[in-house]
Amino acid sequence: MPLSHRSYGAARVVSPRGRLDHDNCEGFQRDLSAQLDACTQEGAALVLDMSGIEYVSSAGLRCLMIAAKQAATRASRIVVAAPQPVVAEILQISRFNLVLPVFGTTREALASVSPQAAQAFDKG
C-alpha cells in the first residue's frame, strides 16, 4: 500500500490508499512505523489521512493499535483524519475513536495538533 506524506510545520500528513486488511497490513505497519520514526525525530505529530482508505478489517485495526502504542512510547502524537463514511463507522463501532482521535477533515486534525500546521495547510 503506497503511503504518501506531506509536512505542514510541526505535523506530517500521511495518506495511505486502498484497503487496510490482512493482505497489506504488514507493509502498512512497517511504512507507518518509519513515518512515526521520522515524526519523532522532527518533533512532529502524525496525521493519518484516511480519505483514501476504502475499508479497514480487524487486521487493519490491529495495525492502527500498534501505531498508537508506538506513538505513545515515543512521546509522539497520532490522529486520524477524514475517514470515508464506511471507515468512520468501523472506527466508531469498534470504539477505536477512543484509542486515536478521529477528525472529519485533515484541516481539523491539523488544527488539533498545531494551529501553525493548520495555517500552513490553508496556504497550500
Region annotations inferred by a language model:
Residues 6, 81, 103:
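General small-molecule cofactor/ligand-binding pocket signal
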Residues 2-3, 45, 86, 114:
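Short leucine-rich amphipathic alpha-helices used at interfaces
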Residues 1-15:
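Short beta-strand/loop segment at the start of cytosolic alpha/beta domains
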Residues 101-124:
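A charged, well-structured terminal subsegment
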Residues 22-100:
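Amphipathic alpha-helical interaction surfaces in cytosolic regulatory modules
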Residues 13-15, 48, 121:
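Short, flexible active-site loops
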Residues 9-10, 43, 66, 80, ...:
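Residue-level detector of intrinsically disordered, flexible termini
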